[in-house]
Curated annotation (Swiss-Prot):
One of its GO terms (cellular component) is cytosol. It is found in: Cytoplasm. Sn-glycerol 3-phosphate binds at K109, G143, S145, K198, D251, S261, R262, N263. Keywords: Cytoplasm, Lipid biosynthesis, Lipid metabolism, NAD, NADP, Nucleotide-binding, Oxidoreductase, Phospholipid biosynthesis, Phospholipid metabolism. The gene is gpsA. HAMAP family: NAD_Glyc3P_dehydrog. InterPro entries: 6-PGluconate_DH-like_C_sf (IPR008927), 6PGD_dom2 (IPR013328), G3P_DH_NAD-dep (IPR006168), G3P_DH_NAD-dep_C (IPR006109), G3P_DH_NAD-dep_N (IPR011128), NAD(P)-bd_dom_sf (IPR036291). This is Glycerol-3-phosphate dehydrogenase [NAD(P)+]. It comes from Cupriavidus necator (strain ATCC 17699 / DSM 428 / KCTC 22496 / NCIMB 10442 / H16 / Stanier 337) (Ralstonia eutropha). Its EC number is 1.1.1.94. Catalyzes the reduction of the glycolytic intermediate dihydroxyacetone phosphate (DHAP) to sn-glycerol 3-phosphate (G3P), the key precursor for phospholipid synthesis. GO terms for molecular function: glycerol-3-phosphate dehydrogenase [NAD(P)+] activity; NAD binding. The keyword Lipid metabolism applies.
Length: 338
């Protein structure tokens, strides 16, 4: 199968390298020098230092040629590997092509800043505006996955959800090999809510661990955080079983407890007294939990959903509340049934 990856960051590169073992894969990025270095050294030194990439992975600096590689093939898939902030631009560029409709997957997790739209809602809006909804297959590949582990060939299980069953089937054919398993879903809303909210909750568990509050506290935050994720997901139209799966509790456990998690690191550094500006300056990579915390809190208010942990994270990030005071406030909440 022909696949094109748009975005040469950690996750796009890792998944492209995995896919190249069984498919005809092209990787595009905004920096031609970075792509040339990947081709010459078989390493993405900026995002996956020390990891050897597949010899079968090809790079292409020309956007149109890269897209045409997969988009002009009947079964091909264009994989958008940008953060949420770049998804509209990529969708717009794909929709503007005069050729046949594109099958596209994205890898990003979060809500759009300002609109609070989920990724599939952003994509649908762009396709509607371009008059290109007919024939476009689109969806998300998501779940508990650290890019470095995938690039190293370690076991991983993900969920693909799309607007057409045929896209999920092709994604399974493309990625379900070696150490990766792909499960299908038709709950686009549910899997995307899980992927967005878990990043915010991971900041909370990171802060708890940074304050030395122990494993009991971590387990409580993960469990009650899952309840918050599920409540918001149901309010937005997701299904409860989705949050019990890979895109819900699975991704939450990994991001909240794994030391490779950028969102968890943000919480740990907030607990150590660093400012958000200092943390983001030193991070070097995207921490989507910071970007979507406000959206989660505002959606909770708009839909009347109780999300005290997510609200506490938002207050620490943007309202000057200390991590220690946020924990104290959560502990002072009235007793209630689970």
């Amino acid at each position: 199968m022909k696949l094109t990856f748009l975005g040469a960051g950690a996750w796009g590169t890792a998944l492209a390298s995995h896919a190249a073992a069984a498919n005809d894969v092209v990787l595009w990025g905004r920096d031609p020098a970075q792509l040339a270095a990947i081709a010459a050294t078989r390493e993405n030194a900026a995002y996956l230092p020390g990891v050897t990439l597949s010899e079968r992975l090809a790079v292409q600096a020309d956007f149109e040629q890269a897209v045409a590689h997969a988009a002009d093939d009947a079964d091909g898939i264009v994989v958008v590997a940008t953060p949420v902030a770049g998804l509209r631009e990529m969708t717009r560029r794909l929709a503007a092509r005069g050729a046949r409709p594109v099958s596209m997957l994205w890898l990003c997790k979060g809500f759009e800043s300002g609109t609070h739209l989920l990724p599939h809602q952003m994509v649908r809006a762009e396709l509607d505006a371009a008059g290109r909804t007919e024939g476009f297959a689109y969806g998300v590949l998501t779940g508990p996955s650290f890019a470095r582990e995938v690039a190293l060939g370690l076991p991983c299980a993900l969920t693909v959800a799309g607007n057409e069953p045929s896209l999920a089937e092709r994604a399974q054919a493309a990625f379900h090999h070696h150490a990766m398993r792909i499960y299908g879903s038709d709950d686009l809303t549910g899997v995307e809510v899980g992927g967005a909210v878990k990043n915010v909750l991971a900041i909370a568990t990171g802060a708890s661990d940074g304050l030395g509050l122990g494993l009991n506290a971590r387990a409580a935050l993960v469990t009650r955080g899952l309840a918050e994720m599920t409540r918001l997901g149901l309010a937005l139209g997701g299904r409860v079983e989705t949050f019990m799966g890979l895109a819900g509790v699975g991704d939450l456990i990994l991001t909240a407890t794994g030391d490779l998690s950028r969102n968890r690191k943000v919480g740990q550094q907030l607990a150590a007294g660093q400012s958000l500006e200092q943390i983001l300056a030193g991070l070097g990579h995207v921490a989507e939990g910071v970007r979507c915390a406000q959206a989660v809190a505002e959606l909770a208010s708009a839909y009347g959903v109780e999300m005290p942990i997510a609200r506490a994270v938002c207050a620490v990030l943007f309202d000057g509340l200390s991590a220690a005071d946020a924990v104290a406030q959560l502990l002072q909440r009235d007793a209630r049934d689970e």
